[in-house]
């Protein structure tokens, strides 16, 4: 739902009436600002010069021949799929963050290329392995369902996370297990084997687990068996074997939350189809490519190296790294300017209508593709035709009013996961390198939007950069330091990373509590060169080291001489023993004796201990007749995702100050979500070990290697 004022979109909210877990995240809220981005294409372009639509379309049609290919990211619009099919060309979809191998598993099982949906409300125990389901993993936004399931009570959701780098999901977990990315398959295999033994079915061969996580993983398996159909196992690795292990475990447990009859179509790109396209370009079998809303030359170095072998026609919102290399570039309207439709999951159909007239000389993607195919229909007529072809009984006006319609789900074949092809990879012994996405930036589609840069990462509390996350132990081994400066800013060491002979130089390093030793990660979406004045040359392109189809690789690291300045909004990372936030376990909470764990603080005075109200030096606000404003945040419900921070900036036109001013702690966000780690040093430990006050407080400032958050 989009709120408009005087013909302008100003706020986006989820449509809670729709039978879909959708919600708004930070990037959705920030997308309103992208509407006004001056770096968007103002008109069609031919050979780098402005052209009319008539000229550009004729030229584009002349380039699209029988040996052309349409290249897109995952398309969930039925109308756009129909328009693409009218072109009569081979269609390849590839995603910057690939889930291709996972989708392969379910395509082989059901005959439909899609992923299962997750019904978190039906789970009582979730075990996620590398799946940041409160961040960017999956097509559904599960934050709302998670918040509802985490209300304290006898049936409160228990959450266990196994992962390499500390994610939003890991920070919210009850139990967190540190595992390298290359160990994810082993972790899933050992859990599966335990469940399989209990069910009396065949197990799989798997490498031994590290001794420091072996008992934890066995304990997880026992909990899953005890929870039965209330269990849920999630896999975040783009691996067919890993996905089969997770899916089969859910099958054996009869998981009610793992729904393979309602499918998720938001990540159906095919790495194998894309690899075949690259081979055809090399051989000359493909001479031109129509790219649609995909910046493939940024995230695929393989495609970038072949760009001069094909004629590109690009439909994009700006002259990005791909469109700038195109013979013809056709400007695509922002989604808030365009008619559109979508079928993100089976059983639901949605429509979008313009909230503002196009600011530039652009057209909707469906209208452009339809015109290239020889059609003359307007965008609204194409969407009307698409809606009419569905199985909904709603009228067009009712569909527009509601924004969605429930439709008949596509019939899918049912069956059991075939485990015969499962091969569990041995973990890397050396240093592993992996990529991940941030809540604000994602894969970089909004890389010229300053709100996505200025939003502090929920875990690291850094803005404006990407950086390698590294454990404290690895930092010592590689000579890496991060130090506070006299003005309160943070500076740190940079490193040169080499993977398969390719080196990224002077990459900043952030020492991250909770990071698994022997594993380093780098966020995607940065290192842009043709995003616009905000996004150009910010950070480094992680895809230069790792293609989207690759989960991890062995790396070598050498510290460099260049120092990097971080834009950190939080310098104190522990509470240093202060009881700012009360935390207790669930059984204690359910005991009902709140006085034992929620004692009201008192302050010493000459009159003796006083409550905060009694010690107040000023008269209390008159809450009966005066203005009053307050807000209480349920810390069990808040995941720290940062969506509200950007939403507040959107609603209140909060200015962006830039990296240099953030380093001076002059950021102007109206909302602040601080993140605190536990420390190994506590008042009780200090008393037991006879540690003095100065040493105690110094050690309290140091987060644990595996902290609670």
Which residues does each PLM region occupy?
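Long, low-complexity segments enriched in small/aliphatic residues
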Residues: 389-462
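Short, polar loop motifs at secondary-structure junctions
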Residues: 162-167, 315-321
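Structural motif
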Residues: 69-71, 126-130, 160, 232-234, ...
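Flexible glycine/proline-rich, aromatic-decorated loop/lid segments
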Residues: 318-352, 668, 673
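A short, gly/pro- and small-residue-rich
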Residues: 136-156, 300-314, 348-351
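N-terminal leader/propeptide and maturation segments of large enzyme subunits in energy/redox metabolism
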Residues: 201, 357-411, 660
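N-terminal export/assembly segments and adjacent metallocofactor-ligating motifs
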Residues: 1-211, 462-466, 473-477, 482-709
